[in-house]
Amino acid sequence: MRDSVNDDPGGEQAKITPPKTWAAGVPAVAHALQYSLAETSPRRTALNLLDINQTKGFDCPGCAWPDPAPGRRHTNEYCENGAKHANDDATTRRVTPEFFRRYSVSELARSSDRWLNQQGRLTQPMVKRPGADHYEPISWRDAIALLADELRAMDSPDEAVFYTSGRAGNEPAFVLQLFARALGTNNLPDCSNMCHESSGAALHETLGIGKGDVSLLDIHHADLVLTVGQNPGSNHPRMLSALEETKRGGGQIVAVNPLPEAGLMRFKNPQKPRGVIGRGTNIADQFLQIRLGGDLALFQALNLLLLEAEDAAPGTVLDRAFIEHRTTGFEEFADHLRATVSWPDVLAATGLTRRQIEELRDRVLASERIVVCWAMGLTQQKHGVPTIRELVNFQLLRGNIGRPGAGVCPVRGHSNVQGDRTMGIWEKMPQDFLDALEREFSFTPPARHGLDTVDSIRAMLEGRVRVFLGLAGNFVRAAPDSERTEEAMRRCRLTAHISTKLNRSHAVCGDTALILPTLGRSERDCQGGEEQFITVEDSMSQVHASAGRLEPASSHLLSEVAILSRLARQTLGDRVPVPWEDFEADYGNIRDRIARVVPGFENFNTRVRKPGGFALPNPVNEGVFPTPGGKARFTRNDFTMLRAPEGHLLLQTLRSHDQWNTVPYTTDDRYRGIHGSRRIVLVHPADLAALGLADGAKVDVVSVWQDGTERRAEDFRLVSYPTTAGCAAAYYPETNVLVPLDSVADTSNTPTSKGIVVRLEPRP
């Protein structure tokens, strides 16, 4: 059995090469096929790749980037990581009861994420009994009865937590939230709590809706696109095709990021001749290598420069009509900026020069239509919410909200994470949603807000949570403060996970633990002899169908909808008049109910069967801002700066290129020039010199937090790398152990994985 260190050859054996300056191209195709063919047969690989993101196929279980309209899609409408992810799920490897007889839970808990994932698909329900160290088979009937009995035995419904990952489709998400609320709790944390919660909080406050307002065509037709705090070449590779269209249309791109990522520099589109035999397309016209946490200061400085440009040439810079008729708070915002922005502070916080920021201003002034895209580089900051509010201020100044070729675009990193929220997966859904549930299902949902991810962990640590149910995902590895999260899970009486593959959350578990194996996206889902489909919502609010055609990995698998419907029926009986059996028999019955509960889903079953599905209405694009005052809101945001004491650095956690969420497919990160290890810390050469450390040295990484607790990631290799001075980077989830549970973003409660104060301790 290999543990998490031995499964990784170790930093001293890693091969380091210069970082790549372009993304995709023929190597991306080769790597995708190499990985896919190692997981499954050529036939299954071909079937899967021909079905991904097609109108009659299945939605890629990877990121939430939207698909082109029907008729504009390629035959191969996927990226390298999407192909890996889909065929990883379609693997021919199987985790059978014999595997669990061979390996104890203790051994599995010492295993690496990569090794666990490589074992293959789960094949039948398994249970770990109290005091046991092995899983054993259990029938579906007994597994659901065991979980239902534990739920019924709780003193309060709030002793249960129902977690959802963005892999879950709309129909199972709707059933899960309905079950939780019928039981009597709003404890519905999800993966969004750890990523784009800051986006939703900021956009709700300023625009009245927690989603972006752009489409693919808006990006294609923009004069200027800002990509801020994101690495599209690895995390949303198909976004590069959209940015290529921006460049072809004459638009410019400015990238703002602490690392000079390959996908921000140049893109070789493998579906076009110039991407195969040519140089490809240059992406960023300007690259601003910003200091961690400096984005708020950057947008404040940029907004001040626009105000000053308007002062110098009144009526030529700001959209005065838009500001007057569609917004509120402008004067207070402008006065605040003029009184508080200090250029020495801005330059210290950003690590940029004034000339660089003025160059960006000049590009803005030359552009009529501007789109701003961002990801977790913003949302996982301590001040992520005010940063995004300031970004919205920037767009409001020139009327770049709610019109063609312009807008705000939070780029979400998991297939249906936005759809899950639309379906009600949130611990604090608005009252009008709860009222709609009550009208439709004749029970009164609880009004008191529930627990998000961080608060769920706190409650588990305090003994206030008895049962944890995870719908997809890998909660233990996705969450911050790994040691405390693991302790929290082990304090539960029962933990259960609806999963396709083995992961660490199955090994770090409660007294009793259930593994409930389910269908993958690419597999056929038949109920009563009738083929079913689920639906998903992408990052740009397009809702479409998803149906697989591969044979299920095991005859013992149940769909997510079937598992949840049976559990709800067994737990609740006739306490609420919900037809759970009908939901399992035909998912169209769920969609009929969604159509009557969720605005924008009217006539759901008919509309979603059209090729490409339908777009949800976005009031912002109609000039309507559903804020309390009916207008978009300028906000005042106080300057703040992340600081590290002398001898310390600011650390960000990030994915490698060869990784999807918590699953590393290999120990390589080839775009960054890292081969053969993930136990790596990227550090600027000037910082290495200042700290008296050598490139290649072995260190422990220790985070510094106000609670005085030592959080340590051991045995990492230093790699001299062109990151921003004063800032370092290391891979997630291995360094989640360094992120304190109580270090969260203001307002959103999102873990601050982009700005951890650390010191590097040389190893003997």
Feature map (PLM): residue ranges:
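Short Cys/His-rich Zn2+-coordinating modules
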Residues: 37-47
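Short, flexible, mixed-charge glycine/proline-rich loop motifs
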Residues: 48-54
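Short cysteine-rich clusters marking metal-coordination/redox-active sites
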Residues: 57-63
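Long, structured ligand/cofactor-binding scaffold of large enzymes
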Residues: 61, 135-224
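Short, non-ligating residues that shape and space the ligands of small metal-coordination modules
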Residues: 69-70
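Low-complexity, highly charged intrinsically disordered N-terminal segments
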Residues: 88-134, 144
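Non-catalytic alpha/beta scaffold blocks inside enzyme catalytic domains
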Residues: 117, 126, 197-404, 410-593, ...
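Long, low-complexity segments enriched in small/aliphatic residues
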Residues: 581-670
